[in-house]
């Protein structure tokens, strides 16, 4: 049974030194439950880049996939914005 609602995230590539793998930083704004102040929360995930089209600084869209390796559970969908 295929799951249709896969998670999609948009982030910035911070590393492309591994072969067919990129590290994407996801930045989100979350509100503190008590102080009601917005905080910037970031996390880094490894994503599979089969054709090695993305470079450091690019804005990319990634999608959740089956585990590819110990750390990779995301795959590159498209490069939204190239670094100039």
Curated annotation (Swiss-Prot):
NCBIfam families membership: PRK05610.1, uS17_bact
GO molecular function terms attached to this record: rRNA binding; structural constituent of ribosome
Stated name of the protein: Small ribosomal subunit protein uS17
GO process terms (BP): translation
Source species, domain of life: Bacteria
Record keywords: Ribonucleoprotein, Ribosomal protein, RNA-binding, rRNA-binding
Pfam families the UniProt entry points to: Ribosomal_S17 (PF00366)
Subunit structure of this chain's protein: Part of the 30S ribosomal subunit.
Role: One of the primary rRNA binding proteins, it binds specifically to the 5'-end of 16S ribosomal RNA.
Keyword rRNA-binding on entry: yes
Family membership noted in the UniProt record: Belongs to the universal ribosomal protein uS17 family.
One GO cellular component term noted in the UniProt record for this chain: cytosolic small ribosomal subunit
Gene: rpsQ
């Amino acid at each position: 049974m295929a799951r249709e609602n896969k998670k999609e995230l948009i982030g910035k590539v911070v590393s492309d030194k591994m072969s067919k793998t990129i590290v994407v930083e996801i930045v989100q704004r979350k509100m503190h439950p008590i102080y009601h102040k917005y905080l910037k929360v970031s996390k880094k995930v490894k994503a599979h880049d089969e054709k090695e089209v993305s470079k450091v600084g690019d804005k990319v869209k990634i999608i959740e996939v089956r585990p590819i390796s110990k750390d990779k559970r995301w795959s590159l969908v498209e490069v939204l914005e190239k670094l100039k």
